[in-house]
UniProtKB/Swiss-Prot annotation:
Source organism (scientific name): Aeromonas salmonicida (strain A449)
Record bears the keyword Cytoplasm: yes
UniProt keyword Zinc present: no
MF (Gene Ontology): unfolded protein binding
Name of the protein in question: Protein-export protein SecB
Length: 156
């Protein structure tokens, strides 16, 4: 019986404790005259994630979305959302933990952040903005490949 317990694999642990909005900001510096212009926006999305260790196996992940919308040279609006979550993660080796924190957790947070951006843009009286889904796994793989290339260059 004891051998059966010892031979069982330790299962990974993942729990969402909380998802919350940490910070929001919306600026429309060139209103109301910007509403008179033909709407052909140049929309730029910047994303960032940060991880804070809160306790052993407890992490805060913060996804920041910054959307800048310009008409020609004038800023129509600037919208920033910090969507955060507290996650309990255990029994994962380091490479999988890094992937979980950098890709899996932001993937959970993104729909909340996207909704917050869409609501603020709409309340600013601008046309609807629907941000496309983001492949955080691909971004993580790209980041890891860049880090490996930089390490190889540094060692050469």
């Amino acid at each position: 019986m004891a051998d059966e317990i010892n031979n069982q694999e330790v299962q990974p642990e993942f729990h969402i404790q909380r998802v919350y909005t940490k910070d929001v900001s919306f600026e429309a510096p060139n209103t109301p005259h910007i509403f008179q212009k033909e709407w052909q926006p140049d929309v730029k999305l910047d994303m960032d994630t940060k991880t804070n260790i809160l306790a052993d196996g407890v992490y805060e992940v913060v996804l920041t979305l910054t959307v800048t919308c310009k008409l020609e040279t004038e800023t129509a609006f600037l919208c920033e959302v910090q969507q955060a979550g507290i996650f309990t993660i255990g029994n994962l080796p380091e490479p999988q933990l890094a992937h979980c924190l950098a890709a899996f957790c932001p993937n959970i947070l993104f729909p909340y952040a996207r909704e917050a951006v869409a609501n603020m843009v709409s309340k600013g009286s601008f046309p609807q903005l629907n941000l496309a889904p983001v492949n955080f796994d691909a971004l993580f793989a790209q980041h890891m490949a860049q880090a490996q290339a930089q390490q190889a260059t540094a060692e050469a």
